[in-house]
């Protein structure tokens, strides 16, 4: 059965940027003698990619962000507008550059490493008109603008607008925002930041290496995050799927098996598809499945934007992979 159509607007607050994508034969090898297979430029950013996903799926999307008044900012806005994302709440920062990110992609695995090409653009004032939250279907905050997202999440909660937090990395500002969040979606990296630390006496580097090799108590981490406010918590685990906590129910979901070309933007596409499904009225498990399918389809293409699927493509993919 096809999911219902999404009608209310999804608002994404955070970063929109321009990605320079470099596909290497082997990112672990020295640059000298290595082979650059492809180079592309695409729009990116957690909130930016998520809102393009909403639009590709047939929903209404609006982004609250800040970009420079340079050529990079022009390209960012042009790309969003071409995808029918409302950019009326994007602040142009005078003298600002970018934001521009560089992604080095490993061809054998599809994994990538990010480097900041230009400084993150800061706005001297909060982004977004809070009045626009009235009647919105969902608010997504990506963690890149703590003051603005706390202000918006608090107002969204007051108005009864579902608030989704992209917790791709953990910062000291996140707990304050999570008190106003309905759905917290953590990356595995962020989840590891909340795991118990290694034994005293280890160097910081050795402690990090040990932590990355140890299995996580995912249920405990979900419960810890829920204790900060969000009644529903999701931890995405890449090729290992995801886990979720809905009230007292703890569940797991496998990832779809696909040929991975590039994982850039997969999490952002997941967040955008999840917001679309939330507004469309999908039940939590169906929504997680829908978002996982959208992210899997994206992984078959270079970059975070080129592979974002349409609603029809996701529905067909789910039909073909039923029971996987």
Feature annotation, model-predicted:
Residues 138-220, 240-242:
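Conserved beta-alpha-beta core of the PfkB/ribokinase-like small-molecule kinase fold
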Residues 79-95:
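A glycine-rich helix N-cap at a beta->alpha junction
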Residues 55, 81, 157-158, 226:
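Anion (oxyanion) recognition and catalysis
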Residues 1-12, 35, 198-324:
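Conserved phosphate-binding/catalytic region of the ribokinase-like
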Residues 1-66, 71-75, 82, 108, ...:
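Glycine-rich phosphate/adenosyl-contacting loop at the front of the ribokinase-like
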Residues 92-93, 103-143:
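Conserved phosphate-binding/catalytic loop of the ribokinase/pfkB sugar-kinase fold
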